[in-house]
Curated annotation (Swiss-Prot):
Positions annotated to bind ATP: G385, E386, P387, D409, T410, W411, W412, Q413, T414, D498, R513, R524
Gene behind the chain: acsA
The name this protein goes by in its record: Acetyl-coenzyme A synthetase
GO annotation, biological process: acetyl-CoA biosynthetic process from acetate
Residues where CoA binds: R190, A191, G192, N193, T309, S521, R582
Sequence positions bearing N6-acetyllysine: K607
């Protein structure tokens, strides 16, 4: 735990939206009287029919029900675009920065409106209606935003699938959502390489078990060769004759806006459902207050729209607030490690929101990341995706921000819809590695394993005591799983699945997942999902997957495999297994270390003792603890002897 404290800088405090006194006052109001607090802040949106009901929620066992602004009517796309046209039609909404540094495009709010309206009309022409699900598998192009906003405009529910996922992962998500349309590009571009997006979609939708797809819309990005099928249609042909006018569908606040799949510990991805009203209130409010957003700011969130960060802090929050933002197709180290700083200078970025993984990757490059840029425009820095270690925090603060920019280290989840625990730039003294204090309306607590509340300085499991507007409403098609996953461990509260420590100043420190979900470079992957892919390989009898500390990615993937009888283990087989997982799941899921073993440590009831595997993977085998329940303790000796992470 870092002992250093960084006070709020005077130059930030003097102009900030919220200072410490205002934070304390607003926070108290939000907890003491959430009804009046959120009634007031719901007015930040434009409503076709104003709400009279604000909060109607219960976490009671068997009756989990979450509703906010339930009698209000609005449209997400209208709030992101149309309401700005009277005063900001010519303001830049999106600055698209290509993978190739020579490519960029400025898109005004008027142009955004016109492109979204034309695409929305195209969707309607294909028979897409309110409530239909639409899958989106695209690179970080303006068209990805047009697609999301186009769906929202007509009331279709989008399900964005990260462009790094494999055909089988795409197919699983399409089958679960029942999507009738997929939107993709011919290819994506990443670090100078082409990514076969259309080919992956083809492989997914041509599976016999995928029966719901009626159309595949293809945006031509690279001009690369693609196979063509009867259900395919080019984006440019779809919108060619469409007018740039499309009346926004009137949506109830509780109508679903999107489904976003996230890894579950059981192996089957969970379709997290977010609705329209409360989600937009919270996404836009957190964006404004946490990043201290002003009219002339240029915001850059470096996430992908395939993840929740790209939904809340690219596709929705900043646009609701009428902000100018960078949409980045590339990676921060291509073509050189100086790229991130160069993009900041090129577009005058004032607020940068990125992940510890990117920061650690840049740290490893010495002076190169900062040598080619001055970054004088930066005012606020942010971190997202996983806890940031103090070393990376200090480097980010000193090197990227020149010791002049507060860092908002934000903790939240796909299921929370928006940032939950975070500093506010003008209100919070910073401690490197701490997410600090809860945002307005968030009531965190720390429980021990038995569900007792821990007061004061404490270390345990993080829970949230009451609902907030952007909370996920359910898991698509499986409300029972929603209740089981988030509300059964500690009945009556929301269980985050994260360990947490609270220090003597009341600051919160997130210590990582307590379930079988890994956090790889800020991407959540279920160990069960990876294990399922591994045991599908004919050479694998049994597999166990654990995380271990990784200098760049935060967590690495360590795999223990027992081969089938008669299988000869070799470097070639190890390489084949690694590529197998890449193909079955995603390159992100590719194992960092693969240890072959004649057996795995199991209890007498046959349960694999993952605690022991985690200790060995982390090279902490001296701290194994009690092994008395093992069926065969000699297995552990063999695993320690042949461990890979020394």
């Amino acid at each position: 735990m870092s002992k250093n404290i960084y006070p709020v800088p005077t130059h930030i405090k003097n102009t900030a939206l919220v200072d410490n006194d205002k934070y304390n006052k607003m926070y108290k109001h939000s907890i003491d009287d959430p009804q009046s607090f959120w009634a007031e802040h719901g007015k930040r949106l434009d409503w076709f029919t104003p709400y009279s009901k604000v909060k109607n929620t219960t976490f009671d066992k068997g009756h989990i029900n979450i509703k906010w602004y339930e009698d209000g009517y609005l449209n997400a796309s209208y709030n992101c675009i149309d309401r700005h046209l009277k005063t900001k039609a010519n303001k830049v909404a999106l600055i698209w920065e290509g993978d190739n540094p020579s490519q960029s495009e400025h898109i005004t709010y008027q142009k955004l409106h016109d492109e979204v309206a034309k695409f929305a009309n195209g969707l309607k022409k294909l028979g897409v209606q309110k409530g239909d699900r639409v899958a989106i598998y695209m690179p970080m192009s303006p068209q990805a935003i047009y697609a999301m906003q186009g769906c929202a405009r007509i009331g279709a529910i989008h399900s964005v699938i990260f462009g790094g996922f494999s055909p089988s992962a795409i197919a699983d998500r399409i089958k679960d959502s029942g999507a009738k349309v997929v939107i993709t590009s011919d290819e994506g571009r990443r670090a100078g390489n082409c990514v076969p997006l259309k080919a992956n979609v083809d492989e997914a939708v041509l599976q016999e078990s995928v029966t719901s797809i009626e159309h595949v819309i293809v945006h031509q990005l690279t001009g690369g060769d693609v196979d063509w099928h009867d259900h395919d249609i080019w984006w440019h042909d779809l919108v060619a004759d469409e007018e740039p006018v499309c009346e926004p569908e009137v949506m109830n606040a509780e109508d679903p806006l999107f489904i976003l799949y996230t890894s579950g510990s059981t192996g089957q991805p969970k379709g997290v459902v977010h609705t329209t009203g409360g989600y937009l209130v919270y996404a836009s409010m957190t964006h404004e207050y946490i990043f201290d957003v002003k009219e002339d700011d240029v915001f850059w969130c470096s996430a992908d729209v395939g993840w929740i960060t790209g939904h809340s802090y690219i596709a929705y929050g900043p646009l609701v607030n009428g902000c100018t933002q960078v949409v980045f197709e590339g990676v921060p180290t291509y073509p050189t490690a100086g790229r991130m700083g160069e993009v900041v200078d090129k577009h005058g970025v004032t607020i940068l929101y990125t992940a510890p993984t990117a920061i650690r990757a840049l740290m490893a490059k010495g002076d190169e990341p900062v040598a080619s840029s001055h970054r004088n425009s930066l005012r606020i820095l942010g971190s997202v995706g996983e806890p940031i270690n103090p070393e990376a925090w200090n480097w980010y603060y000193e090197q990227i921000g020149k010791s002049n920019c507060p860092i908002v280290d934000t903790w939240w989840q796909t299921e929370t819809g928006g940032i939950m625990i975070t500093p506010l730039p003008g209100a919070t003294d910073l401690k490197p590695g701490s997410a600090t204090r809860p945002f307005f309306g968030i009531a965190p607590a720390i429980f021990d394993a038995e569900g007792n509340t821990l007061e004061g300085e404490a270390d345990g499991n993080l829970v949230i005591l009451d609902s907030w507007p952007s909370q996920a409403r359910t898991i698509y098609g499986d409300h029972e799983r929603f209740e089981q996953t988030y509300f059964s461990t500690y009945p009556g509260v929301y269980f985050c699945g994260d360990g947490c420590r609270r220090d003597e100043d009341g600051y919160y420190w997130i210590t990582g997942r307590v379930d079988d979900v890994l956090n790889i470079s800020g991407h959540r992957l279920g160990t069960a999902e990876i294990e399922s892919a591994l045991v599908a390989h004919p050479a694998v009898a049994e597999a166990a997957v654990v995380g271990y500390p990784h200098d760049i990615k935060g967590q690495g993937i360590y795999v223990y495999i027992t081969p089938n009888e008669g299988i000869t283990v070799s470097d070639e087989l190890t390489k084949e297994i690694r590529n197998w997982v890449r193909k079955e799941l995603s390159p992100i899921a590719s194992p960092d270390m693969i240890q072959w073993s004649p057996g795995l440590p199991k209890t007498r009831s046959g349960k694999i003792m993952r605690r022991i595997l985690r200790k060995i993977a982390a090279n902490e085998h001296e701290q194994l603890g009690d092994t008395s329940t093992l069926a065969d303790p000699s297995v552990v000796d063999e695993l320690i002897e042949n461990r890979l992470n020394r």
